[in-house]
Amino acid sequence: MNRIIPPENLPELLERAHMMAGVSLAQIAAQRGLNVPKDLKRDKGWVGQLIEMELGATAGSKPEQDFLHLGVELKTIPIDSQGRPLETTYVCVAPLSNIQGLTWQNSLVCHKLQRVLWVPVEGERHIPVGERRIGTPILWEPDPQELQLLQQDWEEIMELIALGKVEKLTARHGEVLQLRPKAANSKALTQSIAEDGSLKMTNPRGFYLKTSFTAMILNKVFG
């Protein structure tokens, strides 16, 4: 399978993304010589990885934007027949220790969400994975109000992490951004700050965008 060369510039990336609109996942997988999974229970990241590969994304699992040279993060978003997001959107792993001096401006969440290429994909479970079609891509940059909401949630969540209250944080915290356990395996552990300031072990957490927020982004474009 030939590796796709990363796009040289933003117009080239957008052209590639627009060329995928209306195409099924099975068609793209066939071009790349890949098998389509029967369902996504064990292959949750398969759709995102397929789109990343087809567009020539470079980051893989590294903590940086997918198209670092273009300043663009790629996010696939499963939608229903009404164009509404079906699930929250993973942004990045949340730091639970060594967070002194970390600010919103130098956080990975801020870096990743500076400019996002959203690629909607049909996600309703009754549609076989291979038959699901890719939608029209959206290049999004948060406006001042969206940035303020993101920053506010991030700062409140990070303050609770710094106070050792990570266990008290639930998915209900935050208007647009939430913190949730990240690992598929609940035995995975990482260091976090305890309430007395020492370090303790806990499950890794990730930052996720709530569906109400991503629905707002899609609505602005598609109405």
Swiss-Prot record:
Short name of any one Pfam family annotated for the protein: MutH
Keywords: Cytoplasm, DNA damage, DNA repair, Endonuclease, Hydrolase, Nuclease
InterPro entries: DNA_mismatch_repair_MutH (IPR004230), DNA_rep_MutH/RE_typeII_Sau3AI (IPR011337), DNA_rep_MutH/T2_RE_sf (IPR037057), Restrct_endonuc-II-like (IPR011335)
Protein origin, superkingdom: Bacteria
Biological process terms in GO annotation: DNA modification; mismatch repair
GO annotation, cellular component aspect: cytoplasm
A GO molecular-function annotation: DNA binding
Subcellular location per the Swiss-Prot or TrEMBL entry: Cytoplasm
Record has ATP-binding as a keyword: no
Keyword flag Cytoplasm: yes
Gene3D superfamilies for the chain: DNA mismatch repair MutH/Restriction endonuclease, type II
Family: Belongs to the MutH family.
Functional note: Sequence-specific endonuclease that cleaves unmethylated GATC sequences. It is involved in DNA mismatch repair.
Protein name: DNA mismatch repair protein MutH
